[in-house]
Regions:
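Proline-centered linker/hinge motifs at extracellular inter-domain junctions
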Residues: 48, 144-184
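Residue-level recognition of secondary-structure-to-loop junctions
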Residues: 57, 251-258
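Short tyrosine-centred short linear motifs in exposed loops/low-complexity segments
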Residues: 61, 116-121, 191-192, 258-262
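Low-complexity "stalk/linker" and mucin-like segments enriched in Ser/Thr/Pro/Ala/Gly
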Residues: 98, 212-252
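Acidic, Ser/Thr
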Residues: 198-212, 222-224
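Short, solvent-exposed loop/turn segments at the edges of extracellular beta-sandwich modules
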Residues: 269-274
Length: 285
């Protein structure tokens, strides 16, 4: 496929995803997503598709290419280590991408900063699942420009973002994203569990008029990188959602089945819908 054809295809895909995101400002999964492939819900056995979400112009003149994924499975989490089956080029194979792909959609998960003179070059993310190869092409296409606020809102179109207002915390939308910190974790031996605590704070400002506002702040713990499955003890899954962190802290416990290096992500989302990610690395012997 030529570069021009790829750009046209990506633009069409971005338009569909943006429409779905706009329909999803209430936090519910849009009907269109459930029928994304062929109307059949596959529990497992399907591929994972890398997604180029768009790009954000940075104040220093550089650009941030934003990526996510689409796991076609409804129940199966797919693990793809960095390497031939999960690689980004040029500059890879490791450019900070996830290796854990939970069911369905993972939005705005990581960014790759490219220089001012990036021009019409491309960053290509390749995923191969069960012999099926899918690619995402990151490029500075006009139709795929995002704002920083849209990225923090997970693609939801708040009133400020829809108006092109990207000055976080300004007078028309004073809401600032939450801050989050996680203490480092000492190496441990499997199958010993680890307790993780995120300290979270927020300004308490809600969303602008006409936008979605949640009642409480939420913290979601998730596996971002892992060599194999590991489960949060409260949920039994690869993620653990918590509402209204007690005393500004969200604590979870994770038990590992095998040695390796794990990256656990905490995502804090405030009442106005803005989110902040923080990762912590755990080495399991």
């Amino acid at each position: 496929m030529s570069r021009r054809s790829r750009w046209a295809a990506r633009s069409a895909l971005a338009g569909v995803l943006l429409t779905l995101a706009a329909a999803n400002t209430g936090g519910q999964t849009p009907t269109g997503i459930r029928d994304w492939d062929d109307g059949v819900k596959y529990a497992r056995g399907q591929s994972v598709v890398p997604v180029f979400e768009g790009w954000v112009p940075n104040p220093d003149g550089t650009y941030s290419l934003v990526f996510g994924f689409w796991n076609r499975n409804w129940e199966e989490t797919v693990y793809l280590p960095i390497g031939p089956e999960n690689r980004i080029e040029p500059g890879g194979p490791d450019r900070g991408q996830p290796t854990v792909f939970t069911p369905r959609r993972g939005k705005n998960l990581f960014e790759i900063v490219v220089p001012k003179d990036f021009g019409n070059k491309e960053i290509v993310w390749t995923l191969t699942t069960r012999g099926k190869t899918e690619k995402a092409y990151g490029a500075l296409v006009n139709q795929e420009v995002l704002t920083r606020r849209m990225v923090m809102a997970g693609g939801s179109l708040t009133a400020a973002a829809a108006a092109g207002n990207d000055d976080v915390g300004n007078e028309s939308d004073p809401n600032k994203p939450p801050s989050i910190t996680i203490d480092p974790v000492q190496p441990l031996t499997a199958p010993a569990p680890v307790t993780l605590t995120a300290a979270v704070s927020d300004d308490g400002v809600g969303a602008p008029p006409g936008a979605t506002t949640r009642k409480t702040m939420r913290v979601v713990w998730s596996l971002y990188r892992a060599p194999t499955a590991a489960a949060f003890e409260r949920s039994g899954n690869e993620n653990d959602a918590q509402l209204a962190p007690t005393g500004g802290k969200a604590t979870t416990m994770l038990r590992f089945k095998a040695p390796g290096t794990y990256v656990i992500r905490a995502t804090a989302t405030d009442v106005g819908g803005l989110a902040t990610n923080k990762d912590v690395t755990v080495v399991v012997r």
